[in-house]
């Protein structure tokens, strides 16, 4: 039971790490793309 519980914890930790990485990537892309997005919406 302990082994299984540890495996589940590791899996959820890995998932949150990936979500964090994706979120960071998206935020970075938004910051980077803001001038382009603004120029598109400014038309």
Swiss-Prot record:
The keyword GTP-binding does not apply. One of its GO terms (molecular function) is serine-type endopeptidase inhibitor activity. One of its GO terms (cellular component) is extracellular region. Plasma. The record marks 23-24 as: Reactive bond. N-glycosylated with carbohydrates having biantennary side chains. It is found in: Secreted. GO terms for biological process: acute-phase response. Disulfide bonds: none annotated. Keywords: Acute phase, Glycoprotein, Protease inhibitor, Secreted, Serine protease inhibitor. The keyword Amino-acid biosynthesis does not apply. Belongs to the serpin family. The reactive center loop (RCL) extends out from the body of the protein and directs binding to the target protease. The protease cleaves the serpin at the reactive site within the RCL, establishing a covalent linkage between the serpin reactive site and the active site of the protease. The resulting inactive serpin-protease complex is highly stable. This is Alpha-1-antiproteinase 4.
